[in-house]
């Protein structure tokens, strides 16, 4: 799916798929494509969004995450198709805190609750992980 971005899997290595100076989305799995689509949509509003794809949580590419998240002035958003508990968002937050890097930080993830059943597009919209909802959340956080 990420072939058009020149992506090649390397164990434990995160990869910048898109550079951006206003926002950095750190994402994994399905949400990486959504992040790229949201970045493209936000560009129409002159919001420059970078996307860092994290292919593995263990080992986690801490050096790349800390370096990219530490760039001054950017909102850092972790987007994952996982619960807010025990996933990429918590791992990134812990590593940034441990490194003394404190960007504006938000998470896009599934709530820590029993979730409804249904068609995936409907659920993704309901729980805020559709492309449109990701873009809308980021616009709201930048206000």
Outline where the language-model segments fall.
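Thiamine diphosphate
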Residues: 1-143
């Amino acid at each position: 799916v990420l072939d058009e971005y020149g992506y090649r899997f390397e164990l434990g290595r995160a990869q910048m798929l898109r550079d951006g100076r206003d926002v950095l989305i750190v994402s994994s799995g399905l949400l990486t494509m959504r992040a790229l689509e949201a970045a493209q949509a936000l560009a129409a509003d002159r919001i420059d969004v970078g996307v860092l794809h994290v292919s593995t949580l263990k080992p986690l590419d801490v050096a790349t995450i800390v370096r990219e998240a530490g760039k001054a002035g950017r909102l850092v958003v972790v987007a994952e198709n996982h619960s807010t508990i025990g996933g990429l968002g918590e791992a990134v937050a812990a590593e940034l805190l441990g490194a003394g890097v404190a960007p504006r930080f938000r998470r896009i993830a599934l709530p820590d609750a029993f979730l409804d059943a249904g068609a995936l597009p409907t659920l993704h919209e309901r729980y805020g992980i559709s492309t449109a909802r990701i873009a809308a959340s980021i616009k709201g956080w930048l206000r």
